[in-house]
Design a protein with these regions (language model features):
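Short, basic, helix/turn surface patches
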Residues: 79-84, 101-105
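Bacterial N-terminal signal peptides
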Residues: 7-14
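Sec/Tat signal peptide C-region and signal peptidase I cleavage site
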Residues: 14-22
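Bacterial N-terminal signal peptides that target proteins for export
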Residues: 1-6
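Charged, glycine-interspersed solvent-exposed loop segments at helix/strand-loop junctions
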Residues: 23-25, 34, 38-51, 91-149
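Cleft-lining beta-strand/loop regions that shape enzyme active-site pockets
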Residues: 22-78, 84-88
């Protein structure tokens, strides 16, 4: 009887640990790298979990290099988008000017799974490179348990 009770409780315990994910990304197109660093360091330091449940482009992808990968998962709706860093347009007269130093900085945060994927797809370029749900995304980050979505 005790085994049965334990067996019935385990799925609920696991569900609770993921269902109440502390931070859910659903539609994030990125922004200023330094602001994302501060946000994700804070999430990491509080021990929060992250569920990528939609678009995570540009600076949003820094989450993969700042929050431990074992505290991040992706749902079937997740997609990641990567491109070279560029200077804030407010400082360049509205022009999109690539930042090689910024790109190197962003790359230094990414885990090997991201670096490997980018290497196989030509590295960071001015154009957005997307990876969507499926084996390529799962090679970068684990899928979430079914219970969370």
């Amino acid at each position: 009887m005790r085994r049965l009770a334990f067996a019935l409780l385990v799925p609920f315990a696991l569900w609770g640990s993921y269902a109440s994910a502390d931070y859910r990304i659903t539609r994030d197109h990125g922004g200023l790298v330094d602001q994302y660093k501060v946000k994700y360091v804070s999430i990491r330091d509080r021990g929060e979990r992250v569920v990528i449940d939609g678009i995570c482009n540009s600076a949003c992808t820094l989450v993969l290099g700042i929050v431990p990968l074992n505290r991040i998962c992706v749902t079937p709706r997740a997609s990641l988008g990567f491109h070279m860093a560029y200077f804030d347009k407010s400082t360049t007269g509205g022009l999109k000017v690539m930042s090689y130093e910024g790109t190197a900085d962003v790359m230094s945060y990414y885990p090997n799974t991201v670096k490997d994927w980018l290497s196989r797809h030509g590295g960071l370029t001015p154009d957005m490179k997307k990876v969507r749900n499926g084996p390529e995304l799962w090679a970068i980050i684990d899928p979430c348990p079914d219970e969370i979505f």
